[in-house]
Design a protein with these regions (language model features):
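Ferredoxin-type iron-sulfur electron-transfer modules in oxidoreductases and energy-metabolism complexes
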Residues: 1-4, 35, 46-210
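Ubiquitin-like/PB1-type beta-grasp interaction modules and other compact soluble beta-rich domains
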Residues: 5-11
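Short strand-turn-strand beta-turns centered on an Asx-Gly dipeptide
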Residues: 23-25
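Extracellular interaction modules
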Residues: 39-45
Length: 210
């Protein structure tokens, strides 16, 4: 007697990223995978595997806690002080809005991390903050640094990306952008944040401020 196979799921429409797994060697969301796409002929085999860069909880279900920890490292949120009215936000050009909207589509699925040769399984939680942070967190740091309110934490994010496991640990394999289900320009974000950390380091050296 066998028990049902366990996997994670949520939205069933490719917006939450919970069901991400490796299907016939390719990392993707299982909810949008059609049988006919991978097994068009009778007798074809479909192989399902859990992502290899995260600890397996059971069967196809993995623990993505390290992925979310990386978002905490770069403070991927907009700081809000509710003690006073901030008023209306500044106007943005349609081009800037579109850039940020594209970056905001990240669903923290882990595809980019699974494909990245620099990102490896690390089950020791004490080492997470010194391991490569990953393309998703770098891109989200860019998103919030370009937000008029979010950029209040810009210096903190750049400091984190300048530290061990930050943007300089990227090997430029560009696998991340090839597997991203939302086609987010991850390599552009990595390049942009690499330049930003360099400018930040030079400015900090001369001003003494971080």
């Amino acid at each position: 007697e066998t028990t049902p196979v366990v996997w994670d799921s949520g939205c069933l429409e490719e917006v939450c990223g919970a069901c991400t797994m490796v299907i016939n060697g390719k990392v993707r969301q299982s909810c949008s995978c059609l049988i006919d796409e991978y097994a068009p002929n009778d007798g074809d085999t479909i192989t399902l595997e859990p992502m290899s860069k995260f600890p397996v909880v059971r069967d196809l279900w993995v623990d993505r806690a390290r992925l979310f920890n990386a978002l905490k490292r770069v403070k991927a949120w907009v700081p809000i002080d509710s003690t006073y009215n901030l008023g209306s936000g500044p106007k943005e050009s349609p081009e800037h809005q579109q850039t940020r909207y594209t970056l905001s589509e990240c669903m923290s699925c882990g595809c980019c991390l699974e494909a990245c040769p620099q990102y490896n399984l690390e089950e020791d939680e004490s080492k997470w903050d010194e391991s490569f942070i990953g393309a998703h967190a770098i891109s989200q740091a860019r998103l919030f640094n370009e937000h008029e309110t979010g950029k209040r934490l810009k210096g903190d994010r750049l400091e984190e990306l300048s530290s061990k496991g930050g943007v300089n640990d990227c090997g430029n394999a560009q696998n991340c952008v090839k597997v991203c289900p939302k086609e987010i320009p991850l390599t552009e974000s990595i390049g942009a944040m690499g330049r930003a950390t360099t400018i930040h380091a030079i400015a900090s050296f001369f001003t003494g401020k971080k």
